[in-house]
């Protein structure tokens, strides 16, 4: 995500040229056979399309199994087994959404094999639904949406409240997007996502006592400063401030991209990281060090 975050109403993610690749064969029986070239030590993991449920020993295959289950929940029953081989070049646990990539790929395969009439946007929502309800991870929609709807040389301006979106051109003549890996491993299951979501929801409930809003994204910076005293806990004030200000930064970032003002976009990236570090407190020493060292380098326009 270039600017924005899962707790914000508006995000600006973009797609990458790395991803997950698969070869699938529909079976005549109910057996599922999964193999990942990234986890060769696990060998072939077997399951069945009947009675799909998450299992610890199923490891990574809980993601494609979850999508199969989600299709059934949406009225598109997966009746046959499958042999599925996957290979991905997304670093696992790097924050680049390898699990969401597996989910969307599984959706593409099922659509192709069964002729289901489902759009790419609906595939993203099915991926999120499977992760929430089958795997029990309270993720947002941004990762799956960026993967399913990504467009070359464009960021996506996504309103997660309404699912309305538009593409914003990324014109980087003389500049490049660089992704640095901190080697700090984490998954959504052990991240601060659920905790931050709960804090933001509590802050929203307090603000709703004094102003008629449906989400933190409905507030401008000025309105937040006016009404923030309604939030009783100083930690929740910080969390809500990040959500409100980051939402506005995303709107400004899209305007900067449309105007081909990469310098302004970089400033917004920098401000985004400071907010993630100080108000949202989700960065950590590894990310902070990478960003702060990048800021020292001549020619770096922005870093988060």
What is the meaning of each model-derived region?
Residues 17:
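Conserved short S/T/G-enriched processing/targeting/catalytic segments and their helical context
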């Amino acid at each position: 995500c270039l600017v924005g975050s899962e707790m914000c109403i508006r995000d600006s993610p973009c797609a990458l040229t790395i991803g997950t690749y698969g070869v699938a064969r529909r079976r005549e029986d109910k057996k599922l056979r999964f193999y990942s070239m990234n986890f060769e030590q696990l060998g072939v993991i077997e399951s069945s399309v009947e009675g799909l449920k998450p299992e610890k020993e199923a490891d990574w295959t809980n993601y494609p199994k979850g999508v199969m289950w989600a299709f059934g929940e949406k009225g598109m029953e997966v009746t046959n087994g499958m042999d599925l081989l996957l290979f991905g070049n997304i670093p696992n646990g790097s924050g680049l959404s390898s699990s969401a990539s597996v989910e969307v790929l599984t959706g593409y395969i099922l659509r192709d094999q069964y002729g289901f009439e489902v759009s790419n946007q609906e595939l993203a929502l099915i991926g999120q639904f499977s992760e929430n309800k089958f795997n029990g991870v309270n993720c947002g929609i941004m990762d799956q949406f960026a993967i399913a709807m990504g467009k070359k040389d464009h960021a996506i301006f996504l309103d997660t409240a309404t699912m309305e979106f538009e593409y914003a051109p990324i014109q980087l003549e003389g500049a490049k997007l660089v992704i640095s890996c901190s080697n700090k491993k984490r998954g959504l299951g052990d991240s601060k996502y659920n905790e931050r979501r709960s804090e933001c929801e509590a802050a929203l409930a307090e603000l709703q006592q004094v102003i008629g809003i449906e989400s933190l994204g409905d507030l401008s910076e000025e309105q937040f400063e006016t009404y923030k005293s309604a939030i009783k806990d100083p930690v929740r004030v910080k969390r809500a401030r990040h959500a409100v200000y980051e939402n506005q930064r995303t709107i400004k970032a899209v305007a900067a991209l449309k105007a081909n003002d990469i310098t302004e976009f970089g400033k917004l990236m920098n401000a985004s990281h400071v907010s993630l570090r100080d108000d949202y407190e989700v960065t950590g020493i590894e990310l902070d060090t990478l960003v702060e060292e990048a800021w020292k380098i001549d020619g770096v326009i922005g870093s988060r």
